[in-house]
């Protein structure tokens, strides 16, 4: 969610390189909506905790941080290649936070940690419980599907023997094949 906001910032910033300050203000005015939509869109990932509500509160804090950070980042943006910033912003890593200045450490991780660990605690529990349950289920389903496929494939394997049988019949009756071939070739000649 934080990284998605920064990704949105980064996507907008290359456009705003020449009009950094004007564009940045516009983008910041739009950002509560963008970040809210991002947080709501990504809240399923973060589990529907009161994550939509904290973002609305933290967005104000975040905007203040972002205003400081963006001013710093705008300088960094012009210095650093975009890829490194994208990678740094996509992964809110300690190095990224260090780059963004210590403002993020006291500031962002508090809303982030208040939201994330609460989300991460249920989600690992649910994920760890469900994927093992889901994975064996998926595995068994896949195995069943494979069994069904294998059960279906023997008919498929049985039909090729039929086609050799047909080929044997055609070999036994080569004239029909030649007639078919000649007819088709003649039709092709006529068609041509």
From Swiss-Prot:
Q: Does the keyword DNA damage apply?
A: no
Question: What is the protein name for this chain?
Answer: Protein hunchback
Which family does the similarity line name? Belongs to the hunchback C2H2-type zinc-finger protein family.
Q: What does this protein do?
A: Gap class segmentation protein that controls development of head structures.
Q: Report the locations given in the UniProt record.
A: Nucleus
Q: Where is the composition biased (Polar residues)?
A: 92-103
Q: Specify residue ranges for compositional bias: Basic residues.
A: 17-31
Compositional bias, Basic and acidic residues, is annotated for 173-192
Please give the GO cellular component terms listed in this UniProt entry: nucleus
The segment annotated Disordered runs over 16-59, 88-108, 151-192
């Amino acid at each position: 969610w934080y990284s998605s906001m920064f990704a949105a910032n980064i996507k907008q910033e290359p456009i705003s390189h020449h009009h950094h300050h004007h564009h940045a203000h516009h983008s910041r005015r739009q950002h509560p909506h963008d970040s809210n939509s991002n947080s709501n869109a990504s809240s399923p990932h973060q589990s529907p905790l009161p994550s939509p509500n904290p973002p609305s509160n933290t967005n104000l804090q975040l905007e203040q941080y972002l205003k400081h950070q963006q001013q710093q980042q705008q300088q960094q943006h012009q210095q650093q290649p975009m890829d490194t910033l994208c990678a740094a912003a996509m992964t809110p890593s300690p190095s990224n936070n260090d780059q963004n200045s210590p403002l993020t450490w006291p500031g962002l991780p508090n809303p982030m940690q208040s939201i994330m660990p609460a989300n991460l605690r249920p989600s690992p529990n649910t994920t760890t419980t469900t994927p093992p349950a889901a994975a064996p289920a998926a595995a068994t389903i896949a195995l069943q599907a494979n069994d069904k496929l294998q059960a279906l494939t023997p008919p498929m394997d049985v039909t090729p023997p039929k086609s050799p049988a047909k080929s044997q019949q055609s070999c036994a009756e080569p004239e029909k094949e030649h007639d078919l071939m000649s007819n088709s070739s003649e039709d092709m000649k006529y068609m041509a």
